[in-house]
């Protein structure tokens, strides 16, 4: 199965590639400014992963265009910047996080849906980000699948989202980090998804 990894010039990209390869995926990595949508389509990928990166979704090359073009055609997973790109592609706002996270772990609560199916709840994850998708601006077509919580249990920041009808999901944290629990299992759940629609 050919998996296209859109690399947003991030040092973590090849850690993600390694995890996916260990799970049996054939991964082709392209930089976010290396190919047009037509060139990507010509390679006939079965699924796409949009990588983390040091920039904002607006600066992530072909990432948003690829999400919108392939939406409904094949499964798409966004990691960190890729997650934010999904949020922005469908109309959400990406804003400064309340607190910058650089290699910090957090317990994340989830709805046992999609890539989170069967994972620990809460799940300990590793976060490297200064931006988040603003919950109040999430469009109707997207739903929150995972979040950090305030002390009273209310939702703090979005840590996972997915499209309500299409096979498109994002995670704000880094499943490929050694300190994230069940990272392989999360990616394995993505690799089980087929087709563009749920």
From Swiss-Prot:
List each copy of the Glutamine amidotransferase type-1 domain by range.
Answer: 2-198
Instruction: Offer one Pfam family short name for this entry.
Output: GATase
Give residues annotated as binding L-glutamine: 53-55, 84, 130-131
- Broad enzyme group: lyase
Q: Name one GO biological process term.
A: L-tryptophan biosynthetic process
Superkingdom field: Bacteria
Please list the residues that make up the active site: 80, 174, 176
Recorded catalytic activity of this chain's protein: chorismate + L-glutamine = anthranilate + pyruvate + L-glutamate + H(+)
Q: Per the database entry, which stretches of residues form a coiled coil?
A: none
**Keywords annotated in UniProt:** Amino-acid biosynthesis, Aromatic amino acid biosynthesis, Glutamine amidotransferase, Lyase, Tryptophan biosynthesis
GO molecular function ontology, one term from the record? 4-amino-4-deoxychorismate synthase activity
Q: Which PANTHER family match?
A: MULTIFUNCTIONAL TRYPTOPHAN BIOSYNTHESIS PROTEIN, MULTIFUNCTIONAL TRYPTOPHAN BIOSYNTHESIS PROTEIN-RELATED
Biological role:
Part of a heterotetrameric complex that catalyzes the two-step biosynthesis of anthranilate, an intermediate in the biosynthesis of L-tryptophan. In the first step, the glutamine-binding beta subunit (TrpG) of anthranilate synthase (AS) provides the glutamine amidotransferase activity which generates ammonia as a substrate that, along with chorismate, is used in the second step, catalyzed by the large alpha subunit of AS (TrpE) to produce anthranilate. In the absence of TrpG, TrpE can synthesize anthranilate directly from chorismate and high concentrations of ammonia.
Q: How does it assemble?
A: Heterotetramer consisting of two non-identical subunits: a beta subunit (TrpG) and a large alpha subunit (TrpE).
Q: What is this protein called?
A: Anthranilate synthase component 2
- What species is given as this protein's source? Pseudomonas putida (Arthrobacter siderocapsulatus)
């Amino acid at each position: 199965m050919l998996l296209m990894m859109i690399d947003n010039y991030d040092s973590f990209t090849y850690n993600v590639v390694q995890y996916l390869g260990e799970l049996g995926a054939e991964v082709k990595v392209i930089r976010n400014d290396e190919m047009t949508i037509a060139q990507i389509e010509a390679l006939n990928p079965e699924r796409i992963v949009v990588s983390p990166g040091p920039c904002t979704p607006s600066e992530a090359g072909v990432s948003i265009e690829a999400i919108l073009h392939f939406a409904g055609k094949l499964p798409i997973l966004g990691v960190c910047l890729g997650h934010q790109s999904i949020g922005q592609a469908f109309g959400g706002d990406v804003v400064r996080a309340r607190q910058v996270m650089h290699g910090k772990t957090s317990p994340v609560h989830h709805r046992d849906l999609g890539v989170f199916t069967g994972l620990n709840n809460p799940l300990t994850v590793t976060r490297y980000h200064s931006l988040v998708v603003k919950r109040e601006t999430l469009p109707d077509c997207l739903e929150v699948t995972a979040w950090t919580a305030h002390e009273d249990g209310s939702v703090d920041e979005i840590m996972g989202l997915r499209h309500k009808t299409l096979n498109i999901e994002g995670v704000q944290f880094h499943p490929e980090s050694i300190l994230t629990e069940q990272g392989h299992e999360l990616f394995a759940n993505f690799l089980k998804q087929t087709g563009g629609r749920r």
